[in-house]
Amino acid sequence: MLNSVMVVDDESSIRSAVEQWLSLSGFEVQLFSRADECLAQLPKHFPGVILSDVRMPGMTGLELLAEVQRRDADLPVILLTGHGDVPMAVEAMRDGAYDFLEKPFSPETLLGSLRRALDKRRLVLENRALHEQADNRAKLDATLLGVSRGLQTLRRQVLDLATLPV
C-alpha cells in the first residue's frame, strides 16, 4: 500500500503521537522501538517510507539509513532528532536520507515530507515495474518468433498473464 510508514523511535510518547497524526491523516503505520526490529519486518519492495529517530540504543537511525540504502537505495528514509546539528543533517542527507527533521516538528511539516517521499517512492516503483515489463516483452519477443495474428494474440495473452499476482 502506497501510504505505508514504518516509524522507528525508542520514545513511546513520540511513537504514539506520530502514530495518531499519521493514522488520522490516512496513513498505514507500523511502529518499532528498535531499528533492528524494523529491518527484520522490512519487505523487499516496501511501498512506503521509513521515519526514524537518529539517536536510539543499539542501532542508530544513521546506521539504519545505511542498511536501508544497501538494500534499496530508492527507499525514502526520513530522520528525526532532538539533538541535531547542521553537520549531522548534512551527513545524513549526503548518505541518502530523504529529509531530516528536528524535534519538535509540526504535524504539517512531517505530513508534507511524508507525502513527497511517498510520491517519490510510488514513481520509483512504477518505473521499476515498467522496466520489468519491457524486459519481459524483449524476452518474449526473442522466444516467440513470428508476426502472425495468432502469435501476436499469444504474446498479448502471455504479457497479460505475467502481470497477475500469482
Where are these regions (language model features)?
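AAA+ ATPase active-site-proximal loops
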Residues: 132-166
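Receiver (REC) domain active-site loop signature in two-component systems and cognate sites
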Residues: 56
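Active-site residues of response regulator receiver
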Residues: 9, 53, 81
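Acidic catalytic/metal-coordinating carboxylates
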Residues: 33-34, 60-63
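C-terminal output helix
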Residues: 85-87, 101, 105-118
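Acidic, metal-coordinating helix/loop segments flanking the phosphotransfer/catalytic sites
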Residues: 31-49
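Two-component/phosphorelay signaling modules centered on CheY-like receiver
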Residues: 12-30
